[in-house]
Amino acid sequence: MLAASLRVEAVAVVAAAVLVLLLSPAAVVVVAGQHDYGDALHKSILFFEGQRSGRLPPDQRLRWRRDSGLHDGAAASVDLTGGYYDAGDNVKFGFPMAFTATLMSWGLIDFGRSFGPHKEEARKAVRWATDYLMKATAKPNTVYVQVGDAFRDHSCWERPEDMDTPRTVYKVDPSHPGSDVAAETAAALAAGSIVFRDADPAYSKRLLDRAIAVFEFADKYRGPYSSSLHDAVCPCYCDFSGYKDELLWGAAWLHKASRRREYREYIKKNEVVLGASESINEFGWDNKHAGINVLISKEVLMGKDEYFQSFRVNADNFMCSLLPGISNHPQIQYSPGGLLFKVGGSNMQHVTSLSFLLLAYSNYLSHAGARVSCGAGGSASPTQLRRVAKRQVDYILGDNPLRMSYMVGYGARFPRRIHHRGSSLPSVAAHPARIGCKGGAAYYASAAPNPNLLVGAVVGGPSDATDAFPDARAVFQQSEPTTYINAPLMGLLAYFSAHPNPAEWADD
């Protein structure tokens, strides 16, 4: 399990050499390879099969996994089987799972045609999450937000198929509010309803109807789930940014999914009180501000809602903070090798989520024939945004000082000792006997590569500004994969698999 996302604002202004590295397709400090983005896309989706909880389907492709968590929810007399383990542990955390579902869906919504033959695989990955979220919200005014005792789970190193730690169930309700996790769940269901609108209209309607009800609950009973369930969800997934950003985020997705005027009015009415003016260069399972601004800006750029012009201004400011040398905006830091970098663990979660916003916004700008305004005469074209996003994807796939891919199973060199229980322990097929809580300690401490490849998993990656990476299980901040690293990466890989050559991008 990852420690909570560290929200540290970048303060370093990147040198001119890094600007060249990021914006020029030819001038990079590593040898750029010809990447098979389609293969990487396929593998990034396959990763989610390794994170599945519940009864696995006949078409399960990662065969070293088996059924697990078949009695989840029984402690509360509800069915909470299914869903995803968030990372390398065996707990189901609803907050990051919902964000994962939202971002997978956003990728399909914006870049669906680019998924090509992998579109159905991606929809299945979304549905594994939304099916679970429907179970977790089946009781009115209640959202079941976690299954498993994180502290007990983290004291063990055992396969999900063997886990014997308490499967404690945690929920938010009117007496124990959790507007943040509930509104994110509503966003996930609303986004999912768009994904399945044509493929399964009946399911799409059920998702949207539930999203509406869950958002109403989130808004009516306000409060952070970190207060209601502090001992259960902290420090793993405390919501440090508060719940106001999730309420705006949920309303934005419900407006996009339903086109109901009430959600537009909600955003308009609550823009100030819920902090929409906060232009923060962060986006992830905890903080939604940058995502809100990009998502709502599409309405402005498409000429559908000029009232929300302030969101576009915020989105432009955010983009300028990612483009070194373009403006005087406070800048995100980049490593010497060109990796977008934030201090703390699991840096790749920032890399993939911020890169996704760069790509999504670049497409909105292209369709509107617009540019990013950075003030004082500075501006950036959509192509510049795409180049930065592509540079980050290429770094992940191997164009970096270590010449290694940070995606398991992609390329000749990739992490072999990832911090992941199921991957690091012998499979049930290879070792049918149960491995108990402490029985996995020897495997955890072993210097041997993991016996089971969690294909497609992207690890946390370099966590300092030196591009260094110790391929070690114990350094979980760098070696642990998460669902919310891969979720935004799917859309990025889909786009670049269909549009790999910057020279062929439309001139902006």
Swiss-Prot record:
EC number: 3.2.1.4
InterPro entries, alphabetized: 6-hairpin_glycosidase_sf (IPR008928), 6hp_glycosidase-like_sf (IPR012341), Glyco_hydro_9 (IPR001701), Glyco_hydro_9_Asp/Glu_AS (IPR033126), Glyco_hydro_9_His_AS (IPR018221)
Pfam families, A to Z: Glyco_hydro_9
Record keyword Nucleotide-binding present: no
Subcellular location(s) per record: Secreted
Coiled coil spans: none
Reactions that this protein is recorded to catalyse: Endohydrolysis of (1->4)-beta-D-glucosidic linkages in cellulose, lichenin and cereal beta-D-glucans
Keyword annotations: Carbohydrate metabolism, Cell wall biogenesis/degradation, Cellulose degradation, Glycosidase, Hydrolase, Polysaccharide degradation, Secreted, Signal
GO cellular component: extracellular region
Signal peptide segment: 1-33
Superkingdom of this protein's organism: Eukaryota
GO MF terms, alphabetically ordered: cellulase activity
UniProt-annotated catalytic positions: D89 (nucleophile), H419, D471, E480
GO BP field: cell wall organization; cellulose catabolic process
Top class in the EC scheme: hydrolase
Conditions for induction: By auxin in roots.
Keyword Amino-acid biosynthesis: no
Homology family: Belongs to the glycosyl hydrolase 9 (cellulase E) family.
Name listed for the protein in its UniProt record: Endoglucanase 6
